[in-house]
């Protein structure tokens, strides 16, 4: 079962596509830099799960990730 639930995620970001792309991009950041964690405790051990938890908690928003310049 997906944790956090999809309805909790869609309450933060309307589009399922935007949730998926935001989670994927944030998961790559977490994978590359584990110290970039924004929460003190995660339920999931995998980067995608951690990214979804951050979205559900309202810590990560699509604009922050897609406007970032590399």
UniProtKB/Swiss-Prot annotation:
A cellular component annotation (GO) from this entry: DNA-directed RNA polymerase complex
SUPFAM superfamilies: RPB6/omega subunit-like
The reaction(s) this protein catalyses: RNA(n) + a ribonucleoside 5'-triphosphate = RNA(n+1) + diphosphate
Keywords: DNA-directed RNA polymerase, Nucleotidyltransferase, Transcription, Transferase
One record GO biological process: DNA-templated transcription
Transmembrane segments: none
Pfam families linked to this entry: RNA_pol_Rpb6 (PF01192)
Top EC class of this enzyme: transferase
SMART domains: RNA_pol_Rpb6 (SM01409)
Single GO MF annotation: DNA-directed RNA polymerase activity
UniProt EC number: 2.7.7.6
HAMAP family xrefs: RNApol_bact_RpoZ
Family: Belongs to the RNA polymerase subunit omega family.
Subunit structure of this chain's protein: The RNAP catalytic core consists of 2 alpha, 1 beta, 1 beta' and 1 omega subunit. When a sigma factor is associated with the core the holoenzyme is formed, which can initiate transcription.
Function as written in the Swiss-Prot or TrEMBL entry: Promotes RNA polymerase assembly. Latches the N- and C-terminal regions of the beta' subunit thereby facilitating its interaction with the beta and alpha subunits.
PANTHER family: DNA-DIRECTED RNA POLYMERASE SUBUNIT OMEGA
Protein known as: DNA-directed RNA polymerase subunit omega
Organism: Staphylococcus saprophyticus subsp. saprophyticus (strain ATCC 15305 / DSM 20229 / NCIMB 8711 / NCTC 7292 / S-41)
Lineage: Bacteria, Bacillati, Bacillota, Bacilli, Bacillales
